[in-house]
Swiss-Prot record:
UniProt keyword Chaperone, yes or no: no
Protein name (database record): Putative receptor-type tyrosine-protein phosphatase mosPTP-1
GO molecular function per UniProt: methyltransferase activity; protein tyrosine phosphatase activity
Entries under NCBIfam families matching the protein: 16S rRNA (cytosine(1402)-N(4))-methyltransferase RsmH
Family in the record: Belongs to the protein-tyrosine phosphatase family. Receptor class subfamily.
Cell location: Cell membrane
Family matches, as HAMAP family: 16SrRNA_methyltr_H (MF_01007)
Catalytic activity: O-phospho-L-tyrosyl-[protein] + H2O = L-tyrosyl-[protein] + phosphate
Membrane side Extracellular: residue ranges: 29-365
Keywords on record: Cell membrane, Glycoprotein, Hydrolase, Membrane, Protein phosphatase, Signal, Transmembrane, Transmembrane helix
SMART domains registered for this protein in UniProt: FN3 (SM00060), PTPc (SM00194), PTPc_motif (SM00404)
Membrane topology designation: Single-pass type I membrane protein
Domain Fibronectin type-III per the UniProt entry, residue ranges: 143-242, 243-346
Amino acid sequence: MKPRLLTTVTTWLALVLPVVYLSRPCQALPTVNFTANYANSTSIASYNLEPEIPYEELEEPRVLPLKAVLPVEASTVDSSGVIDASKSEHHELPLADAAIQPHPDSNSVLKVILEQPESNDEPVTSTHGYPTFSADDNFVPSKPLNLSVLEVTSTTIKITWREPEKLNGAIHGYRVYYVHQNQTLLHLPILKAEAAVNSVYTYTLSNLKPYTDYKIIVAAFTKKFDGEPSEVSQRTDIAGPSAPKVVNLTCHSQDALFFGWRIPQTYYNTIDYYIISYRNVVYADFREIRITANASIVETSMIIPNLTTNSLYEVKVRAASTSVINPKQIILGSYSEPKKINVQLNCEKIPPPSQRQSYNDYNLAVMIGILICCFGLLFIVLTILLWKKCFHAAYYYLDDPPACGNSGGGNSAGIVDWEAPCEVAGEMRSSIPVCEFAKHVAALHVDGDIGFSKEYEAIQGEALNDEYPSEHSQHPDNKAKNRYLNVIAYDHSRVHLRQVPGQKKHLDYINANFIDGYQKPRAFIGTQGPLPCTFDCFWRMIWEQRVAIIVMITNLVERGRRKCDMYWPKDGTEMYGVIAVKLIREEVMATYTVRTFQIKHTKLKKKKASQTEKLVYQYHYTNWPDHGTPDHPLPVINFVKKSTAANPADAGPIVVHCSAGVGRTGTYIVIDAMLKQIEAKNQLNVFGFLRYIRAQRNYLVQTEEQYIFIHDALVEAIDSGETNIKMDAIGGVVNHIEFIDSQYKLITSYQPKEINLTSALKPVNAIKNRSSLVPLEGSRVHLTPKPGVEGSDYINATWLHGYRRLRDFIVTQHPLIDTFKDFWQMVWDHNAQTVVLLSSADNMSFLQFWPNESEPIESDYYRIRLVSETSENDYIVRNFVIQSIQDDYELSVRMFENPMWPDMAQPRSIFDFAVRVHERCAEYRNGPIVIVDRYGGFQACQFCCISSLAMQLEYDQTANVYTYAKLFHNKRPGIWSSYEDIRQIYRILSYMPKELGLLKCTELRTEFDEAAIMTATPDLSPLTRPAHIMSQHYNRFLKLLERWPVDQSKIGRDLGQYLRDQLKAVLGGTNIIAVKDERLVRQHQSLENIVNDVHLKAHPRSLNSTATGLSGEQCREVLSSEFLEYLNKEGGFEKLGLRGGRWMSTEAVRHVPVMAAEAIKFLKPQDSELFIDMTFGAGGHTKQILKAAPNAKIITLDRDPVAHELAQEMAKRYPGQIYPVLGRFSELPAKLKELNVNQRSIDGMIFDFGCSSMQFDEGERGFSISKNGPLDMRMDKDRCPDAPSAADVLARIDEMDLARILKVYGEEKFAKRIARAIVEARHSIKKIETTKELAELVQTCCASEFRLDKLQRPSHPATKTFQALRIFVNNELNEINYGMILAQHYLKIGGKMITITFHSLEDTIVKRHVMGNVANDMANKLPLKYCSHTICHDQTVMDAALKPNWHQMTKHVVVPSDAEVEENPRSRSAKLRAVVRVE
């Protein structure tokens, strides 16, 4: 709003002031000078009287009443003020009448008349003249009234308003402003205030942007001033989409065209329709087809039917969108370029015109080819001559630094100004000051992170539009070098390996790109996780590019999938091509591992021997989930800082890789660049930098979740600042109270929500808590639950990480009397052999929870016995043995009681105690350290902090108190009560001796398994535990399995009983020898988990629970090493009904017709009657009909060519009775016409829906889960080879549609999760092309490796996904719908129809037809764009056909008997309906 200005106008008035005194004659008054200031339109702010004679010469009283006159307005207004001129020369005079409004741009006269009070005479007025009075912008017009919008289009907005209520002068016109996106202020030329009806004005804003928000401002103005503004906001309407791009127009058949197009490049809001216009060029008019559209689908296609053969057709398409102003209005877009094509017979066999060349064109191409070959040969000869002249025959190259200009075809050395503001997707983007970044991120987080979604979509959109060449990645010689098909290396920025004499040109390829850092071109090399075939290329790149730091952000195997191969030696030295790599040292930390390699070039010549070897450091981050983000950004920030700081100034780029080299790799690079930009310029631009580096390698920062994590990490980095404190500076920090207090506030800023404390706040668990210090759900320690006992898995204990391991400590409260056994259960379950007690027993609230030497503690599974107790200088050491009651397994536990820690006599004793504890733990290295204080709070967490930070100080002479304190608080809020707690940690660390030895006694060595390497810091207990202990665990498992409760209500269906019987039969009395072969670890499913999951409903427990008293981890160790090894060797899996460690599928069973007896009972076939077996399959039902009526005639229909062949064979055995027909339900009318079968002539029809068992038996058909094969699922792929397979559907479908398919057709409760995983795998790994790939991917998305069917039998978790895809690919539900209609038309009155369904949707369609309650969309809720064809019916014909004429033969649906289900498991979900055709 334009501010009101104050302008002072001074008017000198020469006034003749007559003064009349009572009882005295009138005499002339002196002339007085007058000064007036206008404060607003209704008052005079001040005036100044300057009489020509002194005041004291005036006779008493000197009271001068005042009258103000405005002659221009032809009115005189008396003021209510009386002025005493003797008291002051400065007075304030309000004009009481607010109606007086002087015109500031007109001549006004102010006349002041002084008169004698109480005089009856007329005032004497003497005026020397009226001076000119002018005012300032105090007098501005008020707001225009009733500003509103009349009409809106995509580029115009018509507005209207009325003139202001207060004009305050002559209105010269109006100014109209409009604001676009709060950044671009545009104003229109001045509008002349022309006459308008009733003072109503209109104006049309033009040349606006479609679908854009505008704020419109209107203000009146006078000759000198702008008035107060009125505002209104309005969004313009959408404009029509741009022209779609036609990508396919082919002749589909003699009367149909196949037409495909791509979504328009530009559209607003959404695309609602496509309008396809086509015409025979003989005619002028176009015909139109309108179809609904989905803006998320990039390519759309359809078949245009009912065309004239041997005609030329012209086709074009345009998109249309619904108006956002008027939903009833459709905004049409531009037409695509018209395309023409001939429709003719057998056109599908004729190549398109683009492939047919004229004879002259062919000759020209041949001539050009010959010339190219000649030049090529000449070039090769010259190249060979030059090579022989300039190079030695031996293989070598010099160790020169890579040129910055062109050592690999990389991006330009110049720095692109990505920091400059730019407009993307209609919005301005620029660098954000550090002080405003937190507010900026908070704004992006609102409304479900909608701001992040928009920014990331803008980046993704640009990436899709940028088509950078990647020819080398697509070369046949190089495709095998790409881990993922769609993650390639752009040619312009890829890293070139130096040529080896004699090698092919394309052997210089590696899937790696140069990526710029902040103000440093080619600061990084982003690459994929090396494959075995690229190990040598990878190490050549390390050597040639002078790399000193490798950053690895992936584990070798994640979620059962190999993400990277181990490209370095496990021990010693290995050769990778010409590079020898030796592992020198390995330091394992909780979240990352640092490895030191010595690499040597074995073929290098012309260099000193000392320069043939280099040291390379690998920083391997091991706690970053695939496609996800870490739980907290602090460890990542520290990792980025340490790894980048380790790179020497004269070294080459830092090589960063994850699995694909795009998602986590890009996240790392962006965080580093932004940290450097903050340091250099105190600002940052995440959007601009990521947008810039995406032109150097595709898919950098692969998910929106990673993009959000970058912002959150940078907010944390800005808030916390530098948190690593050097050893010699720690003492100074102790006295820096403000610094510690600010850290404390940040450390304790996180406040958990109630959902994070679900278990701790349950009433059954609340009594187990001493205080408000309770564990969060994500970090609490779980106990082995007791069947049927709620809360039996809870204990007030929290996992905390240490310097070496993620689960190094368990912090817990002093046990209550009711939780003594829970405490020892925790020690037993998690194999914790070291306990630190920092509280003392007082025989009141804090009781002794350990046994005396004469009184052991017993539970249902174990006995705790005190072995010894000794006192040392500052603490007491107790040794316990926990003995299993079922077997002879023992667990030794040592307890250190030190209630005075850290208030000990000598500072050195604080650290000596920590060393002593960790030395004890190092003896076993197979479990956590349990730390106990009164409430599981400050004292226990202080011990964890001190011991972890002492190791850090030994390793790199820095301590990060802030990180440990904050992460501990986030896992157990409330442990720090004041900044003094943090200060005390700094104080203790300042006493730390330089040589402590704590780091050495906790040293870990990464153990890698040859088959499945899960993490760089695994639990090493299986490798250190004696073999006889493993056997004891196994024996315990067998014994306790026998005690598993048996469900007597379902004889023969109880899995527990089944397993027990089979175990006895298979194992007998065999003694199993412990096996140490690591290759078997975690390759097979735990039998224990199967038992638990099967009985989950009857005996509720968590999925991680066990029935044996063993922990889930111990069961996996036992079963994966000893038991499964034995079963593999002895064929035990087959004897157990298991295959390869997993449950056998029930698919592979002999073909038995389902409910054949019931079907024949209702069908009642008679000789000479005509039947149709609508789903012949293997002919089971047909055989039963012929058995009941030997002379009956049967038409056998099946879409499967294999089934059709079986029908033909049967027809040879029954000549004149079997009539095989190959086709779908929808094709039956034409087939029956060929057989001269008319409507109302069939005596009975039988439907057995679903997939036949022989289709499951053949893996190459693509239906089977247990047998690997191509993911096909087409029942009639030989007849319709162009129809999309299941693999085609998964390669093209979007996530939303896929989730809907799985949800509706498969009734899959994990539909969204599975759909997301399939789409992510398609983009980041490869397209899913085999049944095994799909089955394994679905399995990773489910909570268990099997599910229970309706008979409580284990089935594969991918069963429902396969079912949904099969139904969709084969358009089964639509076919069922057609089948029901055909039955109504072809059955005689009295004819019978038998339907057998296996899916709820199948039965629903049948039921609705039978009941006469058909919903037209029942079978077609999903888009049919992936189906092989679309069949359209006239609506009136459909309505007539769907009239019900059925009588049900049974009141309820018929289900199979228990005996049949046992004999034929496929029948378990079958439902039979029998109906009769009536009038």
